[in-house]
Amino acid sequence: KVSKNDASEILQVSEYVFSLVKNEFVTKAGVFTGRWFSFKPSREEVEKDSIIIGHRCIPFVNPEVPPDSICVMAEGNVVESSAREFSMNLAMDTFALYGEGYVIPYIFNDKSNTSLALSSVQYSMPQEIRLTCWPLSKISGGKPFHYGDRIICRVISWSDCVVEMKVQDSGLSDMVISDEAVQREEWY
């Protein structure tokens, strides 16, 4: 049996719980399951018809699960991941929110990076690295995906890291930048 004070203390130090007012708490799973969020794939990802998840699902999914193990669903079906070469610059940008000390380990420990060990890197990073990715064509249901379109996401299961994804068409040509897009970029 746990006293009320002990339970409160445990909840206050847990990384899975948000402390509210008047000694009330809510779990991350309770806050983020079913909530919508979005991101805009980079030009490189659009050109390669594949996205890297990286930090884009933080804080919505369980932080104990690495991004290459997240289960992606689209139109009620599991989207199978694959492996593809991406520029190291994109990889570094896409994992940046994990923090400076964690970016490189997350990138090099990706399950698709089977040929390049972190210990083999001497003085400079490789230009490209093989990472786990998900095909945009499967997420978009076979419809064309354009640079500027967004991926709309919703956590289906926080504990199992299941994320539903669909495409929000920007409705703009590649040459037109909307006011909303400018504001979104400024916010990010």
Language model features: what each stretch is:
Residues K1-Y188:
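Acidic, low-complexity intrinsically disordered regions
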